[in-house]
Each structure stands twice: as C-alpha cells, then as structure tokens.
C-alpha cells in the first residue's frame, strides 16, 4: 500500500527543470488571486526560477510584503513541498477574532489546496468552506467564489452531483466578471459534474471553459477542459478524437506542473487505450500515472490502481487484478471518493464473476448502483446497470435481464445518456436467449446503423451475433458469410496486439458476451445438422490454439536458411495468422487406426458439436451444451482426486461423450486423438465408461492435441513416417535428461510456492528414468537448476523429464511456472515465455509434477494456459503432464512402468496406455493413473535403442 505522505519535489529541482533566467522579470501582481495565477503561469511558461527569485528578493527587502509571501507559498505548494508552503503561509492566516482580508482568505485557499493535493479530503472541505466565509467577510468575490468553486468538486464526489452544482451556482453569482481564470475553472468543474450526471451539455461547457482559460493564460484549466472534452468524445463513441484530446490534456497539465491533473489525464488516456485493447500502451500510461500519483495524491493513485486492475483483467490475470483493486478501494475509501469507491466495486464484481462467485458479484453491483445513485452519478449508474444486464444474460436469467434492460433504457430516455452503451446489442442478446432470432436480427440492424452513423464498422460481436441469429433462422449461407467476416475482423485485431500475452488475452474467454468465440458454436451446430460438415469443422478449427499454432509456425520459419536475412527474420518473428488445416488435409494426414475427436463448445447454452474423423470419413454429433456439463465434469474430477467411487459420474458422462464416439468407430480404430474444448480440457477421457461397461482406456490409446492443426504440425515434426512409425535420423547421442528434487528459492514471488508439499520420491524418480536409456543424465538438487536448463544443449535430448513442482494458475500466465533450483543469475522460476524460448528437439517432455496440464477455465478453446503449450512451441513433439496432484509414490510407479515400455520401443501413447492398464488391473484407483495425459504426437518412439548413437553422451554437457 502507498503511504499517504507524498514526497515533495525540491524547489531547486523544479527550478532546474523550468528555469529561464534570461527572461524579463515581472512585477508582483496587486491582487492575491492574480499572484497565485502568476505562479501557475510562470511554471507553465518555464519562468518559475526568475519569478520566484524576484519575489524572494522583494520579501527579503520588505518582510511585511504579504503578496510576495503568498506567491512564494504558492510556488512551494505547486512544487509539492508542503512543509515550505505551510511555513510561508502561516503568518498570512487570520488570527482568532481578527477580521480577515483578501490575502488572508487566499492564504486559507492555499492551505485547502495543499490539503486537497495530499487528498486530505475532510481537511480540504472544511478549509475551503472557511475560506469562502473569509472571502465573504473580506468582501472579496474572487476569494469567496474561488473557494466555493473548488469546494464544489469535492462536494460533488462526497455529497452528490447536485450538491456540487448548487455550490457552483453560488460561486458563479459572486465571482467578478473580470476574474476570467476562476470563471473558467468554475465552467470546467461544472462540465465535469454534468458529465457525471449524464445530462447533455458537458461538451459546450468545457468548450467555454477552454476559451476563457486561454484568455486568462491558465494552462491548468486548459488541461482540465481538454480532459472533460476527451471524456465527452469517448462517451459519444469517438475514441480517436478522445485520444487526441487526452493527449492535449496530458501535455497542458504537465506543462502547468499540475502533477495531480497530469496523473489524472494519464489515467484517463490509459482507460481509453485499455478499452480499445491497446494493453501495452495502456499499461505504460497507467504506470506512468502511478509514478506521478505517488507524488500527486491518493485520489489519482486510487483511480490508477483501479485501471491497472482492469488491465490485469483484460490479460485474464485475476490475482493481479485483485491486488490492484484492493489497493484502489483502500485509497478511494480513505479519500471518501464515493464515485471512485463505487467504480472499484464494479471492477471487483467483474473479478468475482470471473471466478464464478455470481452472488458476490451481484451484491457488489447492487451496492455500487445505490452509492452512485445517491451521489447523482447517473452516467456510472447506467454503466452498472448494463453490467448487471450482462451478467443476467450470461446466467440466462431472462426476467432479471428484461428488468435491467428496461432500467438502462429508462436512464437514457430521461436524457441521462451514455451514448457509448449499445443497448440495441443487448436487446439482440435477450432476443437470442429467449428464442426470438428474427427480433435479434432487427435489433442488430439498429445497432449497426447507430455504429455506422458514428463512422464505425461493424464490431466482431455484432457480426458474430448476426451469424448466430441467421443460423437459428436457417439462413446458413448468410450465417457463414457473417461469421467469416467476424473471424477476419477478430484476426486483424489479434494481429495488432503488441505481445504474446496480449494476444492470448484477446483470445481469453471472458465468461460473458465478450467471449471472442461467441455465436460460433451455434453456427457450427447448425451447419453440422444440415450436413455441411466441412464448413462446420473449418469454423471450429479456426477457434483453436491460434497463438500456439502461430508460435510453432514462427519457430519453423526461423529454421529456414532464407530467414538469415534481417527482413525475412523480422517477417517470420512478427507473423501472426497461420491458416488452420482443412478437413481434407487432416484426413489425408491421419495414420491408420487413428481417429481425431474434435469438440466445439460454446456459452449461453449453445450446443456442443463432436466431430469424429478418420481417413475414410467424418461424422458429427450434437451433444448437450457445455454449460450443462461444467458441473458433471467438475464432480467427476473432484471425485477422482478424492479417491471416491466416481463410476456413476464416469458412466453418466460416458453416455453423453464416449458413446457417440464408440458408435461411430469400427473395430479397426484403436487410437484416439482428442481435441478438447472447455470444460473438457481437464477431463481424463480414459476413465469414461463405454456402453459395454469398459473404460475408454481399455479400448483406445488416448492422446490429446490443442487443435487438429497443431496435431498435424507435430506429425510433420517427426521427420517422416514409415507406416505408422515416425522415423528419426540418429544424429549423435540421444538420451534422457532428468531434473529432480530441485532446491527451493528463498523468495519465489509465487504465493503458492510455500504451500507445496515435499516430493521425497522426486530424486529417485529422476535417477530411475535416467537409467532407462544410455547416454542419459539426472541433475538433482542444486544441479537441477534453471540456469542449467537454459545453458545446456537440448537438441541432443530425446526425453526431457522434470520431477519437480510446478505452479499453474488457471486464470493467467503470470502465476504459472516450472520450479527449478535458483543460481547462476536465475531465480529458479521458469515461466511459460521462458519455456517457449528454449530450443528443444525432444520426442517427449515429461512434467511429473502437480497439475501441469491444467487449462484455464477462462482460456476457452485457446486453452492450455499451463506449461504444455510453451513446450510444444519450443520444439517438443509430445508432452506428458498431469491434470491434478498425484501421490508421490504412485506417480513414481506409473512413471517407471511408462519408461519401461518406452525402452522396449513402444510408441508414446501405447506405452502410457500399457502403464495405466497395469495400474488399473492391479487395483489402483483412477486418481493414481488417470492424471498423467499425453499431448502431441502419439506415435513417437523416443527410446528406440537403434536410434541411439554409441558415441559419448553430450546431452548433459553444459555449453
């Protein structure tokens, strides 16, 4: 948490930044309001050093010069040197019982401004009120009106918009007509409050404030007006104009030395960039605002922390989001900022929703709406109602959704409009959910017409939902065209993201209508029902493992000698879109006896489609919606983990998922490659029961692939085929490299590290697997380090084995890592991006750790937010990983049997099946054998002796 005290900028430092000693030194203004404005102007025009030096000289020559003292105090406050400001201002304040004059009233305003900058809100409120009364007593309309103007913004946040507007009415009545700067400030603050209230007129008010501010040469007020205009342009769906205006606000407030306003403008621009998906630029602005806000005050810090929370949510990093939002709530509550506190509650509701705490999310939104309504912030009330509407739609609570849509429309119809809220789109969602696709199509027409009037092209969501409506109406050609346009638009958006993390975030499942694959499942199912299997499969495949497929393509391209040229290398590194495999191409690539089972699921009760593909044909089956299978899958997995009798759940899910597969396949198919979709990413298909009572593992070898395209690419990596068996050239020694029982780092930065249990069998397991093949090595304890992993040559390793802990955060990449020993300049925490940067040429990587294959529930079909995907991208042809934490001894036994069969030359999937069947027939519970699953090519033979050279081992030699 940030301390409420703020580090001051030393006056010499400020002078060094904005000095201009060669300019003519001005005279001291004759009124206190003009003195304070002159100090602000001197900073904005970079004459602060000369002006302050002149005023200090006047005070030294005449210690009774109260105007010079007031000006020097103002310079100190503007430099955030509050101690110096207080020492200069104290002699100017009215003594008890004395009649105040104008200078005393403005001195009181200075103390209030100082308190406000430090966000001591109660002190600032009472001091501005006292200053207003002192201005009245001194018959100084500028002091009275100036104090009331500044008090109005505080009261607007703490007592409601109407209270603030009433104070501005009073201020306007007493401000002299020639006090242009304070009149401009009053207009700018009125524009802010009107914008919050949601009624029209904020833009013209801000324009008028800008005109007066320019006349008064008041850079700070100019910046405030630009900021309001930017917010107004964002409200009416003109984000490009808003970005320009926020940029002007940032520049003018920085020039004015107003760090509070500067940080606020950075926060607003960061908010805009975040809403446009420009997460890298947004985070840069927000972190810059946070740094400035550390000096400027708690209000800015609170809002900036909140927006950093939103950035973390956009990256599906819910833990990071919670941390920022908790800090935001503390800061905003301590500042009594009711708007900010309520907005932070709505953000926290988003996190609660993401982790399926629906009751908690709704409770927070109700409280936030009440608080915002009491404060008169109708614009944010509308936003909160729309958020409640979205959640009601996602829960299929049609009565609540209808109620919230009506309330939102009522808010806009009473003139309190936030034009950026597309209620027609939500009307379409409600119509789709209640079985009225034609009404949905009409609502989408209205939505797109409104967007066209604003100069915007159709959004991905509009196009995808139109495809869904057309599919439900049986207009399949139109549905295909609309979905194709939606996907093309989304891929352009994804390609524009700056980093892998941002591209993955764009693909992340948000749990509501922001899911990037909305509507796809409905269209796929409609096409499959109509017999358009090829089109249905092609659309489904385009939703899967896009970032992983692109990463693999980039890695392959870099191996091409032509990429030695800088321009070719740059093109390979920046390539984003790789064409997925077609149905015909996949069938041609399938080995004998192999079937691919490809699932497509949706949200909002959309149907699930299962494609079963062999060399000879394709069939498609419609199974229950994924929404109805989330809880059965969870109950089965939890039952397996607890060693409960999960046969009833395995039988029930088998009837839904396994039976159609078995009925579609003849006896000649013995190998399944499953391409899962949420919620099946964590489901061990091995344990599902077939109609004849057998488990699937008893009939099939089962492996998994993130997508059909990734599976085909991994087959190509195997260098060719001889029947069903990949053939590898024996290029040097190829053996097993095992890492086991690494030391724990003293400080991991991962909260869950300290809770992980010891792995007493890990060292023995690593030694044992290293003995299954010649030319192998086990690195244990301190030697099982991240530094060794990164520095060794891994191209000569056929099997890379990790008997160590891992932390997999299903909600985000930042909390996911493989844990090795620290040392050699490395912390021992190997994160996904570090794994994907390795150069691996292994047939198999084994992650014999806890839940290393877990895919985030928020990751949708992109899935695999664990450690599997980065290892595949780095060059592995197969990855064996665990779905849940397994007993250490049971895991060692299963791994031993697995390696024994690999050493006999069995293909990877067959070897794993044999090891599992031995455990099953020996009476082991499914918990002890079903967790370990294989992702990738099932046919590699990593330990075929004939493939191993007799030359000395090099796999373990550091480079």
Summary of predicted features, one role per range:
Residues 307, 330, 346-353, 357-359, ...:
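Alpha-helical solenoid repeat scaffolds used for protein-protein interaction
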Residues 23-71, 78-83, 87, 102-106:
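N-terminal leader/linker segments that initiate helical-solenoid repeat arrays
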Residues 534, 572-959:
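Catalytic cores of enzymes
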Residues 72-76, 108-115, 127, 144-155, ...:
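TPR/Sel1-like alpha-solenoid repeat signature
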Residues 93-94, 132-136, 169-175, 207-214, ...:
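Amphipathic alpha-helical segments of tetratricopeptide repeats
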Residues 46, 80, 119, 159, ...:
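Residue-level detector of the short coil/turn that links helix A to helix B
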């Amino acid at each position: 948490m940030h301390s409420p005290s703020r580090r001051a900028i030393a006056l010499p430092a400020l002078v060094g930044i904005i000095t201009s000693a060669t300019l003519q030194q001005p005279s001291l203004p004759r009124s206190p309001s003009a003195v304070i404005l002159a100090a602000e102007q001197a900073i904005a025009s970079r004459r602060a050093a000369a002006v302050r030096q002149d005023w200090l000289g006047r005070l030294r020559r005449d210690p009774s010069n109260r105007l010079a003292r007031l000006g020097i105090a103002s310079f100190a406050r503007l430099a955030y040197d509050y101690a110096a400001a207080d020492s200069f201002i104290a002699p100017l304040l009215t003594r008890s019982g004395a009649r105040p004059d104008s200078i005393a009233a403005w001195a009181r305003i200075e103390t209030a401004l100082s308190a406000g900058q430090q966000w001591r809100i109660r002190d600032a409120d009472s001091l501005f009120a006292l200053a207003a009364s002192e201005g009245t007593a001194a018959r100084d309309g500028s002091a009275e009106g100036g104090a009331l103007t500044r008090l109005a913004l505080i009261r607007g946040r703490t007592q409601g918009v109407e209270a603030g507007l009433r104070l501005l009415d009073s201020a306007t009545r007493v401000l002299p007509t020639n006090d242009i700067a304070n009149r401009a400030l009053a207009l700018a603050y009125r524009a802010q409050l009107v914008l919050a209230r949601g009624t029209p007129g904020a833009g013209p008010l801000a324009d008028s404030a800008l005109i007066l501010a320019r006349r008064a040469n008041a850079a700070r007020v100019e910046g405030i007006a630009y900021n309001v205009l930017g917010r107004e342009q964002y409200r009416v769906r003109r984000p490009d104009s808003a970005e320009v205006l926020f940029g002007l606000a940032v520049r003018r407030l920085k020039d004015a030395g107003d760090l509070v306003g500067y940080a606020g403008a950075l926060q607003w621009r960061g908010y805009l960039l975040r809403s446009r998906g420009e997460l890298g630029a947004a985070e840069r602005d927000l972190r810059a605002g946070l740094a400035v806000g550390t000096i400027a005050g708690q209000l800015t810090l609170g809002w900036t922390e909140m927006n950093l929370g939103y950035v973390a949510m956009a990256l599906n990093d819910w833990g990071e989001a919670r941390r920022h939002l908790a800090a935001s709530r503390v800061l905003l509550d301590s500042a009594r900022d009711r708007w900010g506190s309520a907005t932070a509650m709505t953000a926290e509701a988003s996190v609660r929703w993401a982790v399926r705490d629906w009751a908690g999310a709704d409770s927070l939104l109700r409280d936030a709406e009440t608080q915002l309504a009491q404060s008169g912030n109708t614009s944010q009330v509308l936003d909160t109602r729309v958020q409640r509407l979205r959640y009601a739609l996602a829960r299929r609570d049609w009565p609540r959704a209808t109620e919230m849509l009506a309330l939102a429309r009522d808010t806009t119809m009473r003139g309190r409009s936030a034009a950026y809220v597309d209620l027609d789109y939500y009307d379409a969602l409600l119509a789709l959910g209640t079985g009225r696709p034609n009404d949905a199509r009409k609502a989408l027409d209205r939505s797109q017409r409104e967007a066209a009037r604003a100069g915007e092209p159709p959004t991905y969501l509009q196009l995808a939902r139109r495809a869904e409506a057309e599919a439900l109406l049986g207009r399949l050609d139109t549905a295909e065209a609309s979905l194709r346009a939606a996907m093309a638009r989304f891929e352009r958006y994804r390609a524009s993201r700056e980093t892998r993390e941002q591209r993955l975030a764009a693909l992340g499942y948000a749990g509501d209508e922001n899911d990037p694959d909305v509507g796809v499942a409905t269209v796929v199912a409609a096409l499959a029902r109509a017999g358009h299997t090829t089109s249905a499969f092609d659309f489904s495949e385009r939703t899967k493992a896009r970032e992983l497929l692109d990463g693999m393509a980039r890695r392959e391209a870099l191996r091409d000698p032509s990429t030695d040229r800088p321009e070719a290398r740059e093109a390979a590194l920046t390539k984003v879109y790789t064409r997925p495999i077609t149905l015909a191409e996949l069938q041609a690539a399938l080995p004998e006896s192999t079937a691919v089972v490809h699932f497509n699921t949706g949200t909002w009760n959309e149907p699930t489609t299962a494609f079963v593909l062999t060399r000879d044909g394709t069939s498609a089956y419609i199974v229950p919606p994924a929404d109805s299978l989330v809880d059965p899958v969870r109950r089965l997995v939890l039952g397996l983990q607890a060693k409960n009798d999960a046969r009833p759940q395995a039988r029930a899910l088998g009837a839904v998922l396994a039976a159609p597969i078995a009925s579609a396949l003849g006896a000649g198919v013995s190998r399944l490659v499953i391409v899962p979709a949420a919620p099946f990413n964590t489901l061990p298909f091995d344990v599902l029961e077939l109609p004849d009572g057998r488990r699937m593992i008893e009939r099939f070898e089962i492996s998994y692939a993130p997508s059909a395209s990734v599976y085909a690419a991994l087959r190509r990596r195997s260098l060719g085929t001889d029947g069903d068996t990949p053939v590898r050239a024996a290029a040097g020694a190829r053996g097993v490299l095992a890492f086991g029982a690494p030391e724990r780092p003293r400080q991991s930065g991962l909260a869950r590290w300290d809770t992980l249990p010891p792995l007493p069998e890990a060292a023995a397991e690593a030694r044992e697997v290293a003995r299954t093949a010649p030319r192998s090595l086990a690195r244990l304890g301190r030697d099982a380090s991240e530094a060794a992993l990164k520095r060794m040559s891994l191209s000569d390793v056929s099997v890379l084995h990790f008997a160590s802990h891992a932390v997999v955060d299903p909600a985000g990449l930042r909390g996911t890592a493989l844990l090795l020993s620290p040392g050699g300049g490395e912390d021992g925490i190997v994160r996904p991006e570090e794994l994907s940067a390795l150069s691996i040429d292994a047939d198999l990587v084994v992650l014999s750790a806890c839940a290393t294959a877990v895919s985030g529930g928020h990751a949708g079909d992109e899935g695999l937010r664990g450690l599997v995907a980065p290892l595949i991208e780095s060059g592995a042809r197969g990855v064996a990983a665990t779905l849940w934490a397994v007993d250490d001894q049971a895991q060692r036994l299963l791994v031993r049997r697995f390696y024994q069969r690999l050493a006999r030359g069995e293909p990877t999937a067959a070897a794993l099946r044999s090891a599992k069947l031995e455990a099953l027939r020996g009476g082991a519970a499914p918990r002890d054998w079903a967790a370990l699953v294989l992702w990738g090519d099932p046919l590699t033979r990593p330990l075929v002796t004939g493939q191993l050279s007799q030359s000395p081992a090099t796999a373990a030699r550091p480079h």
